[in-house]
Amino acid sequence: MDEDEFELQPQEPNSFFDGIGADATHMDGDQIVVEIQEAVFVSNIVDSDITVHNFVPDDPDSVVIQDVIEDVVIEEDVQCSDILEEADVSENVIIPEQVLESDVTEEVSLPHCTVPDDVLASDITSTSTSMPEHVLTSESMHVCDIGHVEHMVHDSVVEAEIITDPLTSDIVSEEVLVADCAPEAIIDASGISVDQQDNDKASCEDYLMISLDDAGKIEHDGSTGVTIDAESEMDPCKVDSTCPEVIKVYIFKADPGEDDLGGTVDIVESEPENDHGVELLDQNSSIRVPREKMVYMTVNDSQQEDEDLNVAEIADEVYMEVIVGEEDAAVAAAAAAVHEQQIDEDEMKTFVPIAWAAAYGNNSDGIENRNGTASALLHIDESAGLGRLAKQKPKKKRRPDSRQYQTAIIIGPDGHPLTVYPCMICGKKFKSRGFLKRHMKNHPEHLAKKKYHCTDCDYTTNKKISLHNHLESHKLTSKAEKAIECDECGKHFSHAGALFTHKMVHKEKGANKMHKCKFCEYETAEQGLLNRHLLAVHSKNFPHICVECGKGFRHPSELKKHMRIHTGEKPYQCQYCEYRSADSSNLKTHIKTKHSKEMPFKCDICLLTFSDTKEVQQHTLVHQESKTHQCLHCDHKSSNSSDLKRHVISVHTKDYPHKCEMCEKGFHRPSELKKHVAVHKGKKMHQCRHCDFKIADPFVLSRHILSVHTKDLPFRCKRCRKGFRQQNELKKHMKTHSGRKVYQCEYCEYSTTDASGFKRHVISIHTKDYPHRCEYCKKGFRRPSEKNQHIMRHHKEVGLP
């Protein structure tokens, strides 16, 4: 048989278990080979203890074998002993290694290693086939004499398939059967008989402790092996087959001749430290230590009698820790994010996206596990005979970010402490703050919760300055509420309506009180009438007063526009629709907003719009032609003779041959009179309450009342001793003595040269229309408020209707 050359290549976390059958040749020494992800140092010390750790040894002659994922350190002076006489011996072992970042191929002579042809282990075959999801286990694989490494493979080789896909949720099957000599490679968990007949086994065997992390209750009935009770309380993630599982495997040194291994052990809060090397570090009093399901397994002879488990006296040293499942944190986190959307919100999320050992330094207080509680911390004791076991102090825990995120320290794959960012909601841990921020989007119900809440209302915000500004608004509101004060008694009210009701009480008490003007002898029983008197008579800034509401204006044109609010007159009508407006500016705005599409053509100078191009061209001629037609009476210029004629007739012609039969108003042209007559259609005549004057225009009636029926006329004409309320009215009156045409009122002695003033006089003075009548005395009023005040004053025993 030719000599085989094989390569040692590290694989993903797989375990090789040796099942010693009845026909297998028994050799002294350790009987288990474990392939792990971390760096492994195999010592050649012939002792009952073996050192396996993840630190670089002190021996400078060690050969370093590196791979992308893991590092393995093996001393060069490894010897192999003859175990199988019929097997061929592999003289040369080619081991690729990276020393000082350079690729070196070194031949290590193993003169006594026997490698048969039917080697199926993926890390021993010459083809170096990578099988991350399968573990090929021989029935005889031994590590003997502590410092001598042997790989033995018999003819009857079976294949054990262990699924370690990080995206598969059921990593640990619901039932683990342990037997011996089965068609498949089975891990025997039967207890080791105390009365072992082979007393020559003086060396120790290696045993495994598998932490299932509350995957289910592990039961052992002696004959059938170790099973997982699927009826026990399971994780929701496992039921849905969406969450990956992490298995922790702890390898112990124990003496099979003295201890019975196998079965299940529950480590509870009352067992802070046991006899088998697993120490539960002290936790804070406020953190509850959860129960952890653990099973201890060993390779045992199938012919041994089943005994009850006794793990109280297991060996004092844990010398290896292996984690199976979730090798890649990023892939697991991505898979968890995909499945998390399908999990019900009420179900508890019970998986952790990082496959690192959850261990802390001495100064760590704890970390939330995937169930939201603090997990017990496992401590690996140091053996007295292991002098070369390096001690590594973990880095100090970083100060947590008090603003948003907290940090935790765990032991990474390379053995060094790493800072992670745990999610405080589901317990997931991430390498960077950015991954945590991205993960927090999966908890919208918690992101919606805001930090700051207003104690006075339901306002919430995440910014402190926003809450401060909101509280200031409460202060301003409280001040504004207190700002409404009664001027008679000083009482404060929250709104104007309450103040108005309160003032009615004062009016009832002082119903007979007369309000006097401080500038003249005018007096009235109503405060509102006194206010209007002050505005109309003694106000210089707003001489033109509205008799309906008492509002003053600087110019008569403004008062005229305002009076349309009370009369409801809307003389401006849209030529495209039935829209009417009391103001020309509102009509222009209406046309631009509503009919801009109907008139797409605009003038570039004045921005007026037209329906077609011909109208635009005709309109532009107005801007292009020079205004050559000069008015002989003023500085007005027109672009054509027709415009000039229209200007002369309307401004400089005092003869109005066309008179209105209803209001006696004159016009220059019949068309103007026709438009004016249309105003009177549908309108009722307004009668003055002081005289027989009536007019259709209420504005003229208001001017009539103010000018004729007001006794206070401080401005007197020196020539005719006629009185006027304002100085500008006196100036207009003085023009009547200069020979100009005077408009004489037919109802009184009022006369003026101003046609608009004459119209206002007739409306304000000689109008007698009071639409709001009292139901009890039939007295008329101009506004409903005046009628209500009258009822409260004179008919208070009846009350408001």
UniProtKB/Swiss-Prot annotation:
One of its GO terms (cellular component) is nucleus. It is found in: Nucleus. Keywords: Activator, DNA-binding, Metal-binding, Nucleus, Phosphoprotein, Repeat, Transcription, Transcription regulation, Zinc, Zinc-finger. GO terms for biological process: regulation of transcription by RNA polymerase II. Probable transcriptional activator. Binds to the consensus sequence 5'-AGGCCY-3'. The binding of ZFY to DNA is mediated by the interaction of the GGCC core base pairs with zinc fingers 12 and 13. This is Zinc finger Y-chromosomal protein. It comes from Gorilla gorilla gorilla.
